[in-house]
């Protein structure tokens, strides 16, 4: 069967500043919390990553050669404002002007994110977005970038508000490494959504000609037994933590009664309270209809069953399949032993979950306008033999997900593009350099790029816009 994607569809590749650039201490860049945290807690650092800071002309030439017409890039906040606010770093500004010019030279449209997990250390150490002062600093940084970089037509404020809060305060694998604090998770999500809303309102008030949105990671949640009300509730509660709380803030400007009932239940079981103010909701209401697009990062779905025990989360960071555990008191337990394939990192491969998630957005948040799939891809332990990388599993993964995107477009959803994670191999926040996602293999010792088999497949896809399934 042949499925076709629209003629104006973006076939993109995604990157992130800290995961790709390297150059973490040169040309005036300020520190981020990850710099010290990686040295203290992991077996790798962000040096040299993919050395995108110096190699970007090569990467963009490859993008053009292989038919990629869009790229997700994030600006490193601390490369513009080393302390998060105050004095501007001219060398950082010049770098991004050069980078965006190179994008346009190669006919690759930059979709630019302002924050991709990398708050400057000077602000992170003061509480990051748990501190409401950080909202002011982020909005000032955003306003500066909107004005300074008119060559950017597509902006996103944040990448994955959900996983930021989860990583920092639930799983505890992101700095500051706090575990099982659900109140901090929700408060971080809420405050970051306020920062998004203020930046969004500012962008529209200034009447900039481009478009602006936000990127959410949206793993679909299913009950292990759909006929068991307790399992259904477990899936709904996990969905509130990871998806619905931030989606309500984005498109409703408030938290629905059902969402807040779930939040109150979770906090009653786990402790803590939230600081939600009337003026917060005035701001969210002012912003809810201004998003030009929603970016969805989708990798996996989860199956939940009811659970009465204590919270325990074990993160599988080394690709040892079966090493994960995820159970939250009063919420539920994720079950990995279901009839669905999974990666070595226990990520469940379920393309139907992307279809279901998009249709949920269409039904529950009809003001969404349009969607880009801003990240999707397969983490794999690729091997390079004489410059050849056969990654058929990645091709199959991408093909399956693009097929359901074609289906969901046929069902009436407005999906305008797809950005594979990642354009080239980058370092993974909590998995290091062994977990590769790129279309282009990076030899991290030499920084030489090698197109994988998937790159040639993607090139053909971009040319024909058809998928054979």
Swiss-Prot record:
Q: Which domain of life is it from?
A: Bacteria
Q: Which GO terms describe its biological process?
A: lactose catabolic process via tagatose-6-phosphate
Q: What class of enzyme is it?
A: hydrolase
The EC code for this enzyme is 3.2.1.85
Active site per the UniProt annotation: 160 (proton donor), 375 (nucleophile)
Q: In which pathway does it act?
A: Carbohydrate metabolism; lactose degradation; D-galactose 6-phosphate and beta-D-glucose from lactose 6-phosphate: step 1/1
Q: Which residues does UniProt assign to the signal peptide? A: none
Provide one Gene Ontology cellular component.
Answer: cytosol
Cross-referenced Pfam families: Glyco_hydro_1 (PF00232)
Q: Which key words are in the record?
A: Glycosidase, Hydrolase
Catalytic activity annotated for this protein? a 6-phospho-beta-D-galactoside + H2O = D-galactose 6-phosphate + an alcohol
Family, similarity comment: Belongs to the glycosyl hydrolase 1 family.
Q: What is this protein called?
A: 6-phospho-beta-galactosidase
């Amino acid at each position: 069967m042949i499925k076709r994607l629209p003629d104006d569809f973006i076939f993109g590749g995604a990157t992130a500043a800290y995961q790709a650039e390297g150059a973490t201490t040169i040309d005036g860049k300020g520190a981020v919390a990850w710099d010290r945290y990686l040295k203290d807690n992991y077996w790798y650092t962000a040096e040299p990553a993919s050395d995108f800071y110096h190699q970007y002309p090569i990467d963009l030439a490859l993008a053009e050669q292989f038919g990629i017409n869009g790229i997700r890039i994030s600006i490193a906040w601390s490369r513009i404002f080393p302390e998060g606010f105050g004095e501007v770093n001219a060398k950082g500004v010049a770098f991004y002007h050069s980078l965006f010019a190179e994008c346009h030279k190669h006919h690759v449209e930059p979709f630019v994110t302002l924050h991709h997990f990398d708050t400057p250390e000077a602000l992170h150490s003061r509480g990051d977005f748990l501190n409401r002062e950080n909202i002011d600093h982020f909005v000032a940084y955003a306003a500066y970038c909107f004005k300074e970089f008119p060559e950017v037509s597509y902006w996103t404020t944040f990448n994955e508000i959900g996983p930021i809060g989860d990583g920092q305060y639930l799983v505890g694998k992101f700095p500051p490494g706090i575990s099982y604090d659900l109140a901090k998770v929700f408060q971080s999500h809420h405050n970051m959504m306020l920062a998004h809303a203020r930046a969004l309102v500012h962008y529209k008030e200034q009447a900039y000609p481009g478009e602006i949105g936000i990127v959410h990671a949206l793993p679909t949640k299913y009950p292990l037994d759909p006929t068991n009300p307790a399992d259904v509730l477990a899936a709904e509660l996990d969905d509130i933590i990871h998806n619905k709380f931030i989606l309500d803030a984005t498109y409703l400007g408030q938290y629905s009664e059902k969402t807040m009932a779930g939040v109150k239940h979770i906090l009653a079981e786990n402790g803590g309270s939230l600081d939600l103010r009337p003026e917060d909701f005035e701001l969210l209401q002012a912003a809810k209809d201004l998003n030009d697009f929603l970016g969805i990062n989708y990798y996996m779905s989860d199956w939940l069953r009811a659970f009465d025990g204590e919270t325990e989360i074990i993160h599988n960071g080394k690709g040892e399949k079966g090493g994960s555990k995820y159970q939250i008191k009063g919420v539920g337990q994720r079950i990995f032993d279901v009839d669905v394939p999974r990666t070595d990192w226990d990520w469940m491969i379920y393309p139907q979950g992307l279809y279901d998630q998009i249709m949920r957005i269409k039904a529950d948040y009809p003001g969404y306008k349009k969607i880009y799939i801003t990240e999707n891809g397969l983490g794999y332990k690729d091997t390079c033999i004489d410059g050849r990388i056969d990654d058929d599993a990645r091709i199959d993964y991408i093909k399956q997900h693009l097929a359901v995107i074609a289906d969901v477009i046929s069902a009436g959803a407005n999906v305008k593009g797809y950005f594979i994670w990642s354009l080239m191999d980058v370092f993974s926040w909590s998995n290091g350099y062994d977990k590769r996602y790129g279309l282009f293999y990076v030899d991290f010792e030499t920084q030489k790029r090698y197109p994988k088999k998937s790159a040639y497949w993607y090139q053909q896809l971009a040319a024909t816009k058809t998928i054979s399934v």
